């Protein structure tokens, strides 16, 4: 049986992609940094404000990836920009489409300086009323959460603001979400409005271990004169880097999600090892102090359901006690299988009992519908070596998919 459909990524009129040249990118620069870059290349001071406004509009509103498409920019200026800078997209190594419409891109970024090309994954999840893009912040991860596939890939490096934003730009390219663009044939997407209406920093890596680049990327993504995403439609998920939580609310101002997964320190030390450094009391205290926290701006607590590990009603009672006084929503996540894991997903009946108990205590407790499992795009499954999975592992994964099929019905 085939568990995925790979689609052709070499279509005509595709956005310009990186060729590996080490020109600096204008993507991800603040207006001040862009102005400084133009000034350094000899652009007259009296023109800089206008040129920055033009570039900002072409890059983030019109979505161009080639300076030659900037029709209101003088030809000599375009030639200078082409000579010294790039606005190209990352290379699409592979694009996969799940049976449920979820899309996963394996993206390759060129070497910068003494570095080497790196690969990351981004995932698009379409729903009737919205489209959510799951963005990566690091290549690999240091956290080694025991149930998470990404945690089995060592950290290579942080992504730059350019590389974080490029995931959003590329997704909008591929989905026809910029002006005068068409969506691919047969694409499952929201019926109206933006194709990418929400972004979640829930891909590969821990965003708060890459705070400065994530901050800059999200401030550009929510800039009203560019990509214009609402901060209420941007969610940053952390495993609990306590010192950076307050800064996230104060300096970025987006919605916060916490990868919780356990209500006892002894268990969370195993599932989410960062808990040894920042235990539950410190984490919850930081959540209570999150700027802007209210019933209208609740914190989302993510809780993966692991059979006979954290899914008892005693755990549910502990969860309610732990979150007392925190405006919260609790996302229950059926565990998504990946090759080599020793964990199993809780029985569906137990997940529903757990959810009902939480709900009766006054907390919204939606059960997240597993999306993109068949292409390793679901929560906890991302890993950029996935395209090199051995045949035996793929067969094992297909067997797991068949065994778990009933859990999603």
Curated annotation (Swiss-Prot):
Residues 1-24 are annotated as: Disordered. Its main location: cytoplasm. The keyword Transmembrane helix does not apply. This is Dual-specificity RNA methyltransferase RlmN. It is an enzyme of class 2 (transferase). Belongs to the radical SAM superfamily. RlmN family. Its cofactor is [4Fe-4S] cluster. [4Fe-4S] cluster binds at residues 141, 145, 148. One of its GO terms (cellular component) is cytoplasm. GO terms for molecular function: 4 iron, 4 sulfur cluster binding; metal ion binding; rRNA (adenine(2503)-C2-)-methyltransferase activity; rRNA binding; tRNA (adenine(37)-C2)-methyltransferase activity; tRNA binding. SUPFAM superfamilies: Radical SAM enzymes. It comes from Rhizobium etli (strain CIAT 652). One of its GO terms (biological process) is rRNA base methylation. It is found in: Cytoplasm. Specifically methylates position 2 of adenine 2503 in 23S rRNA and position 2 of adenine 37 in tRNAs. m2A2503 modification seems to play a crucial role in the proofreading step occurring at the peptidyl transferase center and thus would serve to optimize ribosomal fidelity. The active site is at 121 (proton acceptor), 379 (s-methylcysteine intermediate). Binds 1 [4Fe-4S] cluster. The cluster is coordinated with 3 cysteines and an exchangeable S-adenosyl-L-methionine. Reaction proceeds by a ping-pong mechanism involving intermediate methylation of a conserved cysteine residue. Disulfide bonds join 134-379. S-adenosyl-L-methionine binds at residues 205-206, 237, 259-261, 336. Its EC number is 2.1.1.192. InterPro entries: Aldolase_TIM (IPR013785), Methyltransferase_A (IPR040072), RlmN_N (IPR048641), RNA_MTrfase_RlmN (IPR027492), rRNA_lsu_MTrfase_RlmN/Cfr (IPR004383), rSAM (IPR007197). Residues 127-376 form the Radical SAM core domain. Keywords: 4Fe-4S, Cytoplasm, Disulfide bond, Iron, Iron-sulfur, Metal-binding, Methyltransferase, rRNA processing, S-adenosyl-L-methionine, Transferase, tRNA processing. It catalyses: adenosine(2503) in 23S rRNA + 2 reduced [2Fe-2S]-[ferredoxin] + 2 S-adenosyl-L-methionine = 2-methyladenosine(2503) in 23S rRNA + 5'-deoxyadenosine + L-methionine + 2 oxidized [2Fe-2S]-[ferredoxin] + S-adenosyl-L-homocysteine; adenosine(37) in tRNA + 2 reduced [2Fe-2S]-[ferredoxin] + 2 S-adenosyl-L-methionine = 2-methyladenosine(37) in tRNA + 5'-deoxyadenosine + L-methionine + 2 oxidized [2Fe-2S]-[ferredoxin] + S-adenosyl-L-homocysteine. PROSITE patterns: RADICAL_SAM.
């Amino acid at each position: 049986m085939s568990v995925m459909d790979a689609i052709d990524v070499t279509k005509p009129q595709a956005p310009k992609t990186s060729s590996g040249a080490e020109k600096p990118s204008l993507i991800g620069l603040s207006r001040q940094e862009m102005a400084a870059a133009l000034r350094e290349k000899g652009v007259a001071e009296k023109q800089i404000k206008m040129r920055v406004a033009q570039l900002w509009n072409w890059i983030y509103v019109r979505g161009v990836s080639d300076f030659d498409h900037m029709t209101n920019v003088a030809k000599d200026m375009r030639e200078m920009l082409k000579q010294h800078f790039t606005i190209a997209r990352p290379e699409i190594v592979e694009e996969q489409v799940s049976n449920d419409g979820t899309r996963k891109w394996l993206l390759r970024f060129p070497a910068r300086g003494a570095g080497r090309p790196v690969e990351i994954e981004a995932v698009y999840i379409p729903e009737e009323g919205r489209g959510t893009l799951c963005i990566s912040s690091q290549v690999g991860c240091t956290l080694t959460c025991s149930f998470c596939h990404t945690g089995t890939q060592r950290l290579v490096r942080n992504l730059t603001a350019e590389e974080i934003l490029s995931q959003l730009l590329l997704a909008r390219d591929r989905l026809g979400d910029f002006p005068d663009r068409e969506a691919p044939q047969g694409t499952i997407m929201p019926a109206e409005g933006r194709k990418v209406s929400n972004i979640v920093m829930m891909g590969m890596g821990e965003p708060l271990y890459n705070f400065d680049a994530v901050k800059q990327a999200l401030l550009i993504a929510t800039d009203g004169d560019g990509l214009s995403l609402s901060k209420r439609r941007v969610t940053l998920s952390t495993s609990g880097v306590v010192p950076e939580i307050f800064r996230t609310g104060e300096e970025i101002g987006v919605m916060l999600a916490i990868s919780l997964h356990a209500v006892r320190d002894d268990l969370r030390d195993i599932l989410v090892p960062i808990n040894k450094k920042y235990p539950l009391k410190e984490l919850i205290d930081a959540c209570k102090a999150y700027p802007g926290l209210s019933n209208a701006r609740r914190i989302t607590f993510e809780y993966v359901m692991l059979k006979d590990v954290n899914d008892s009603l005693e755990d549910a009672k502990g969860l309610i006690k732990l979150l007392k006084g925190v405006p919260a929503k609790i996302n229950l996540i059926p565990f998504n299988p990946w090759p080599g894991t020793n964990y199993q997903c809780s029985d569906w009946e137990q997940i529903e009992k757990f959810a009902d108990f939480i709900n009766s205590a006054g907390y919204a407790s939606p059960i997240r519908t597993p999306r993109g499992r068949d292409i390793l795009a679901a929560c906890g499954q991302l890993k950029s070596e996935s395209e090199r999975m051995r045949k035996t592992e793929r067969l094992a994964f297909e067997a797991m998919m068949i065994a778990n099929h009933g859990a999603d019905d």
